[in-house]
Regions:
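Hydrophobic, ordered structural segments
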Residues: 118-120, 134-139
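A subset of signal/propeptide-processing and intrinsically disordered low-complexity segments
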Residues: 9-12, 16, 116, 133, ...
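Short non-domain terminal segments
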Residues: 1-2, 8-9, 31, 201, ...
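N-terminal amphipathic/basic-hydrophobic helices that include classical n-h-c signal peptides
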Residues: 1-21
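Hydrophobic transmembrane signal anchors and adjacent membrane-proximal interface regions, especially
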Residues: 3-5, 124, 221
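Hot-dog-fold acyl-thioester-processing enzymes
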Residues: 19-82, 127-131, 138-223
């Protein structure tokens, strides 16, 4: 009985401290990264795909720390999925360069939430910004679920609508009528993530691979917009 009481008191204290820590967290999260050499291309700058992974990692850290991330959601058969991503870059971090990703949510609706990113070096020089739209789905039915209800309104406590992000609100990605098929890609093991579908950054990498390397000797990516319409899975053809 004495041992049980001690364990109960310990758990109670842990929960209280955890809630206190969450309540003291800022609305904007800041996370440090390094442009490691094996994540850089032949120009000695970070691969766009790896920068995208850093943005998603920052989003994951931010949401998990505040109680509405994948760690909690998976326990109730839910998860986050990326619906839209827009990134504008004035510069890409160079090899061995330290950089910071800031992230925050400026609004939340029933089925979608808007997440922002700011990428700087350690001295505050701004490399670029990002805007994204996320949905929450049931991992069994794959259908959207009520974000506010699932997060017990916790997400609403961390909204930051006043922090500047100069990127314009995402609009519908328009496609020309005369587009021609450039390549078909069969999805394989390394494309599939923890949600059992093609990872959102893998689409970006596949698109960038459509351009010859000579293109990247002359130009660099300054802006991209991508909309995720439906899930793809292993052995699907893109």
């Amino acid at each position: 009985m004495q041992i049980f009481i001690r364990i109960s008191l310990f758990l109670q204290e842990y929960i209280i401290n955890r809630i206190s820590d969450m309540n003291n967290l800022p609305k904007i999260g800041k996370y440090n990264f390094v442009a490691e050499p094996f994540h850089c291309d032949f120009t000695k700058h970070l691969f766009i795909g790896h920068l995208g992974n850093n943005l998603l990692n920052a989003a994951d850290f931010h949401s998990n720390d505040r109680g509405y991330g994948v760690n909690y959601l998976n326990s109730v058969n839910k998860t986050w999925v990326l619906s839209r991503l827009s990134v504008e870059l004035d510069k890409i971090p160079a090899i061995y360069e330290d950089f910071v990703v800031e992230t925050w949510i400026d609004s939340v609706m029933r089925y979608f939430t808007n997440r922002n990113f700011k990428i700087t070096n350690k001295d505050g020089y701004v490399y670029g910004y990002g805007k994204s739209i996320w949905a929450m789905i049931d991992t069994t039915t794959r259908q959207p679920v009520d974000i506010l209800k699932t997060s017990n309104e916790t997400i609403s406590e961390y909204l930051e609508a006043d922090y500047a992000n100069p990127i314009k609100k995402s609009s519908r990605v328009k496609l020309d009528d005369d587009l021609k098929l450039q390549q078909s890609i069969l999805t394989t093991y390394s494309d599939i993530d923890i949600n059992g579908h093609v990872n959102s950054i893998k689409y970006i990498e596949h698109i960038l691979d459509l351009f010859p390397i000579e293109y990247y000797k002359k130009y660099r990516i300054k802006k991209f917009d991508i909309a995720y319409i439906m899930e793809s899975h292993n052995n699907d053809k893109l």
